[in-house]
Each structure stands twice: as structure tokens, then as C-alpha cells.
């Protein structure tokens, strides 16, 4: 194992470069960290978050002197000063940007862990840990990008390896890289917000909203203990929560969140096509999937709905229709929106499975209502209150990413001339367009259903169309419901080859729906009871979903639909 590692290092560092790089690297490390420590010492007490300013200033000076040392003593390239200096900044600057986001996490964690007498040393220890993580990555970036030649070009090797991959493998890599870039941008914006606003997460938004940490689970437990109907949850989910509500809240939260994350990661791993370093790409896709972390951050019970929907999709794909009917009945008895997937039974003429699903829905609902003493009148009032609160008032704009919010958002922004005028205008507009919106979405869903049943697009496309309808068509649909998108995404990644432009376009649209966007926010209203903070996702995600929906239906024609209807009813099962 050790010999293999040594040989690998020799292949990366030909000739004397390893020794020269080591000497220069040691000097750069000592110089950079010494300058950082000196600036921390000098600025401490004069500026808030002095270690952040020290990190920025020391990086600027250290990167410039490192450029000359690497150019003249390690890689010994000729000319191209400005080009190589800019490239050097691109390598070191990227590392510095990531470090700028990671440094406060290290420092604040060390401050929390260190004894009181040593807390003042946290910035120095955090800087040392961060420095140790960047040495090897910096060399690879400098050698293969800043001072590269044609012979040692990492880019050329990447192109060669890319050419050997199948199109499904390329989709995985492309999607993973976009998700990773989105995650790093979120980190960078978090660090920038820290510098500009002098606040550190969780006082500023990163991937989540820190005001509601695990609140969905805790509120549901409180409701379950009071034996009242819970928000918009159906009897099955509330009955389960009542059964476990007497347990310790933190343990329940840890168990549920761990279960959802582990299930999500395992689904991604099993669903990816075979490719090199599959485990690494699985981690990359999971870490970059914002809906998973938002669901975990809120500890929302949508995780159980997702598990049931995943069970349905897997069972349906494998032809186990009885299990598919069972899992879909469980999902619908937790929340109604997964009922859209019953269209797949019609698509494959699985009428018996459809009938079994309907019977199971009634039986499970009746049994859970009886066992949990479910109060349907209170449930109806709670649903109505929740709908009025989220559907008509501007509060629903904060986390909801539906097409309905896409219509309301311009009205709210255009009437921001002071409260309560903007609220009244938004409420009036919401009530005005709500009936028409409901009719339009029902009509669009009927159109999509007809397309799925009679035209019979590929399974991944049918599943994606129905999932988009499930997530974006309702009046209210919060960010964590986007977790369902990973199911059609995995089938798309395994789809047969298609035109490259089509593959790239769909991959980009799906990535936009999954990357974090909550870091781009603006606060419109603040009170002791509630803050209204709009984020970019409430606008960009429905927009991307609309574009993707139109693209998936671009080949529709009434002639094909007519032919499909004729074939559907004339062909044998």
C-alpha cells in the first residue's frame, strides 16, 4: 500500500519538482501562516472577526510572492507573466475562497470546544488546520493549470477520459460538477455575507433558514401530544407521530434525519449507472442536493413521503404492481400530492393494481383514522387556515416555489411602497387569480396525463413530468418537496443515448432545481413573531421548471395523441 502511494506521488511529481516544490511549499506555508497569525494578533480587538480580515490580506500578499517562487524555482516556465499570474490567482484564489468560508466554521467550532483559557487561540489553530488542507491541492492546480505544458496538461487527460465515458456516465459527471459548483458558491456567498454584514451563520442564511431549525418535527410532536389534527398531515402520518411522540425529541430528530439522509444516499448509489469512482459521485450528488439538506434542517416529515414514493417507483419499475399499489397508498395517506403517480397505472393498463390502490387508500385511511381518533373537522379547519396563510398572504412567498407564487411575486415586489398596502395588493391578487389558477393547473395536469398515457414517452420522461406536476402545480409546495425530483433524475441519468444538446439542456435544468439558492435573500418584513425573507429559489426554480416542462412537451402533437388514443383502446393489454 505504501509503495503504491509512493509510486503515485512520483508519477504526479516528475524529476526534481517534488523536492523543489516541497522547499518552496514549506516556505510559503510558514510565510503565509506567519503573516496570517501576525495580522490576527495586530487586528484582534480592533475589528470584528479579525481573523477573516487577516485571512484576506495574508492571502493577497502570500499568493503574489508564491507566484514568483513557483515560476522561477519550481516549474521554470518562460514568459507569460500576466497569464500565469492570473491563472495562479485562479488556483490559489479558489482555494482561498473556499478557505474563507471554511475558516469561520473551524474557528467557531474550536471556540466552542476549547477550554475558556484557550479560546483566544482558536483563530490561530483554525488557520493552521486550514493551511494543512490546501498544500497538495494547490500543487496539483499549479502544475496542471497555472504552469502547465502540453505534455503534463491535466485538461488533456480529462478530455481523454471524458471521451471514453458513455453518455449516461457523462450526465452523472456533469450533474455532479454543477451541484458541487452550486454548493461552493453557497459557501462563498456565506463568507461574503459574513464580511459585509459582520454576522456569522446561523445569524445569516447559508443553505437553510436558521430561524426554523428542526421546527417542523418539533411542532408536529407538540400537536401529536395534544391529540389534535396536525397541519396538513393525513391520519397515517399523524397516527405514527402520536405513537412516537412521547420519546425524547432530540433522539427522535436524530433518528429520523439520519434515516432520511441514509435512505437518500443509498437510493442515489443504487440508481447511478456504473462508472469509475461511483461512491465519490454519489457523495457529490448527495452533498450538492439542496432539498435533502433543507428537509434535514427543517426535519420535515416529507422524508417519509419520499420513502414511500421511492418504494412505489422501484416496485413499479420492477413490475411488482401489488407492492407499487401498497407504497403509493401509504404515500397518499400521508400527503395527497403523490396521487399524481396513479397515472402510471393507466399508462401500462394496470387496472387491477389501480383498483387495489384505491381500496388500500380507503382501508389505510379508515384504519388510521379509527386508531388515531383522528378529528377530521379540526383537520379541515387546520388545512383551511394553513392554505389561507400560505396561499393568500405574502408569508407563502418565503419557501414556496410553485407556479402560483411565480404569478404572485411580481405583484408583491411592484407594490412594495409600505405595509400594509403591499400585503393588501398581494392578498387581493391571490384571491382573484386562485380560481383561474386551479382550473388551469387541473387542465394542464389532464393534458400531461393524456400525454403520458396515450403518447407513452420514455419512463424517465413520464416520471419527470408527473413529478414536476406534483411539486410545482399546487398552491403551496415548500422547498423540501423538491427531494422527489431525485427519482426521475436517476432514471434520466440511466436513459439511453440522446442528442448531446438535449442531454446537456435537461441536465442543466435539473441541476438548477437541485442547487442551493436560499443564500440569495432579501428581507421585506421583520417582527418579533415573523420575518418575511424572500430567496432566489422562489423565483428561479419555478422558472426553470416551466422551461423544462415546455421542453419535455415540445414534441407533442394532436395527431400523435389521436393515434395514441386509438392504439391504447384497440391494442390488447
Language model features: what each stretch is:
Residues 78-95:
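Juxtamembrane helix-capping/reentrant segments at transmembrane boundaries
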Residues 328-345, 473-484:
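Transmembrane helices and adjacent periplasmic/lumenal helix-loop junctions
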Amino acid at each position: 500500500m505504501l509503495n503504491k502511494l509512493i509510486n503515485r506521488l512520483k508519477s504526479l511529481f516528475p524529476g526534481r519538482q517534488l523536492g523543489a516544490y516541497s522547499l518552496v511549499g514549506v516556505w510559503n506555508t510558514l510565510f503565509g501562516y506567519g503573516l496570517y497569525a501576525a495580522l490576527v494578533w495586530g487586528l484582534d480587538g480592533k475589528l470584528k472577526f479579525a481573523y477573516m480580515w487577516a485571512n484576506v490580506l495574508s492571502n493577497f500578499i502570500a499568493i503574489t510572492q508564491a507566484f514568483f517562487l513557483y515560476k522561477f524555482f519550481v516549474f521554470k516556465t518562460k514568459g507569460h507573466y500576466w497569464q500565469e499570474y492570473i491563472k495562479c490567482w485562479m488556483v490559489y484564489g479558489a482555494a482561498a475562497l473556499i478557505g474563507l468560508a471554511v475558516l469561520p466554521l473551524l474557528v467557531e467550532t474550536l471556540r466552542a470546544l476549547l477550554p475558556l483559557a484557550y479560546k483566544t487561540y482558536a483563530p490561530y489553530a483554525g488557520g493552521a488546520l486550514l493551511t494543512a488542507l490546501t498544500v497538495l491541492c494547490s500543487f496539483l492546480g499549479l502544475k496542471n493549470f497555472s504552469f502547465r505544458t502540453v505534455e503534463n496538461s491535466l485538461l488533456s487527460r480529462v478530455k481523454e477520459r471524458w471521451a471514453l465515458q458513455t453518455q449516461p456516465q457523462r450526465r452523472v459527471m456533469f450533474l455532479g460538477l454543477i451541484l458541487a459548483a452550486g454548493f461552493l458558491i453557497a459557501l462563498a456567498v456565506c463568507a461574503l455575507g459574513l464580511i459585509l454584514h459582520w454576522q456569522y451563520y446561523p445569524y445569516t442564511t447559508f443553505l437553510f433558514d436558521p430561524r426554523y431549525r428542526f421546527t417542523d418535527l418539533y411542532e408536529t410532536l407538540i400537536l401529536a401530544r395534544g391529540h389534535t389534527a396536525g397541519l396538513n398531515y393525513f391520519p397515517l402520518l399523524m397516527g405514527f407521530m402520536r405513537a412516537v411522540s412521547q420519546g425524547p425529541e432530540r433522539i427522535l430528530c436524530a433518528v429520523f434525519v439520519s434515516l432520511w439522509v441514509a435512505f437518500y444516499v443509498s437510493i442515489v448509489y443504487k440508481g447511478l449507472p456504473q462508472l469509475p469512482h461511483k461512491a465519490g459521485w454519489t457523495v457529490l450528488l448527495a452533498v450538492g442536493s439542496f432539498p435533502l439538506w433543507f428537509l434535514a434542517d427543517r426535519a420535515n416529515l416529507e422524508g417519509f413521503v419520499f420513502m414511500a414514493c421511492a418504494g412505489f417507483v422501484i416496485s413499479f419499475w420492477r413490475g411488482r404492481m401489488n407492492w407499487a399499489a401498497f407504497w403509493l397508498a401509504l404515500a397518499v395517506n400521508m400527503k395527497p400530492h403523490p396521487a399524481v403517480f396513479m397515472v402510471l397505472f393507466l399508462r401500462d393498463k394496470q387496472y387491477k393494481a389501480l383498483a387495489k390502490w384505491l381500496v388500500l387508500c380507503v382501508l389505510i385511511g379508515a384504519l388510521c383514522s379509527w386508531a388515531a381518533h383522528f378529528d377530521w373537522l379540526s383537520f379541515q379547519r387546520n388545512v383551511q387556515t394553513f392554505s389561507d396563510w400560505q396561499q393568500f398572504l405574502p408569508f407563502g412567498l418565503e419557501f414556496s416555489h410553485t407556479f402560483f407564487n411565480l404569478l404572485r411575486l411580481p405583484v408583491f415586489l411592484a407594490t412594495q411602497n409600505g405595509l400594509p398596502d403591499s400585503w393588501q395588493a398581494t392578498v387581493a391578487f391571490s384571491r382573484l387569480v386562485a380560481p383561474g389558477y386551479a382550473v388551469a393547473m387541473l387542465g394542464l395536469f389532464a393534458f400531461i396525463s393524456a400525454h403520458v398515457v396515450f403518447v407513452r414517452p420514455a419512463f424517465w420522461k413520464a416520471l419527470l413530468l408527473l413529478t414536476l406536476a406534483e411539486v410545482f402545480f399546487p398552491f403551496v409546495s415548500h422547498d423540501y418537496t423538491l427531494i422527489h425530483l431525485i427519482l426521475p433524475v436517476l432514471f434520466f441519468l440511466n436513459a439511453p443515448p440522446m442528442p448531446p444538446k438535449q442531454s446537456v439542456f435537461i441536465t442543466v435544468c435539473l441541476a438548477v432545481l437541485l442547487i442551493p439558492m436560499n443564500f440569495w435573500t432579501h428581507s421585506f418584513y421583520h417582527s418579533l413573531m415573523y420575518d418575511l425573507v424572500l430567496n432566489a429559489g422562489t423565483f428561479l426554480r419555478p422558472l426553470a421548471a416551466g422551461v423544462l416542462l415546455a421542453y419535455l412537451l415540445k414534441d407533442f402533437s394532436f395527431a400523435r395523441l389521436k393515434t395514441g388514443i386509438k392504439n391504447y383502446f384497440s391494442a390488447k393489454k
